[in-house]
């Protein structure tokens, strides 16, 4: 996304996703992610410290960390039962981002690319197919609560990880890592050379 021309970056910002263009953290720290997943209370949407401090996690936090919309209608994922009207391929999305002029197809390609790679990744290289279909079949201009969707999806991923022990945690664990690394939370969590100390 760094190589996109300014008019495309402006269109992404106008959609409410400008924060993704400025993400500073692009590498996951697996020891920290493992600790976050073990300490996360899905039922109450909070991170529980050993010091009995609980840090709530809300869609507003997702908006502040990732710079995506946290208002509007809820995202409803439609399960397609017929043949899809497109191919699920990240390379096609990358080509669309590079080659298409700013317009509805460009914006849909960006949304799907962002969700397949950053906001709602799963163990497949191309993300959740039903989300592709939902975005392709909807209007881009409708304001949606993408932050709430991201939080629900990563919480569902944590739940699946705990119950079925897959090798991959689906969802935006990058959000959780950046969230706990913010100055506001560093007073609660001190991270030093992959060891976690509670202040």
Each language-model region and where it sits:
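Long, internal protein-protein interaction and assembly surfaces
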Residues: 71-73, 85-199
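N-terminal leader regions that mediate targeting or early regulatory function
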Residues: 1-104
């Amino acid at each position: 996304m760094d190589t996109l021309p300014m008019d495309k970056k402006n269109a992404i910002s106008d959609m409410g996703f400008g924060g993704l263009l400025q993400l500073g953290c692009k590498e996951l720290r697996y020891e920290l992610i493992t600790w976050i997943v073990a300490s996360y209370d899905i039922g109450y949407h909070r991170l529980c410290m050993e010091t009995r401090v609980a840090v709530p996690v809300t869609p507003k936090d997702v908006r502040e960390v990732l710079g995506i919309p946290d208002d509007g209608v809820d995202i409803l994922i439609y399960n397609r039962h017929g043949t899809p009207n497109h191919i699920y391929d990240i390379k096609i999305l990358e080509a669309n981002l590079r080659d298409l002029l700013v317009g509805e197809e460009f914006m849909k390609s960006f949304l799907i690319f962002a969700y397949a790679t950053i906001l709602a990744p799963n163990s497949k290289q191309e993300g959740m197919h039903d989300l592709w279909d939902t975005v392709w079949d909807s209007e881009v201009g409708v304001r949606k609560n993408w932050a709430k969707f991201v939080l629900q999806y990563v919480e569902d991923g944590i739940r699946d990880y705990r119950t079925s022990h897959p090798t991959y945690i689906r969802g935006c664990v990058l959000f959780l890592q950046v969230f706990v690394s913010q100055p506001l939370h560093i007073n609660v969590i001190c991270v030093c050379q992959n060891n976690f100390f509670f202040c």
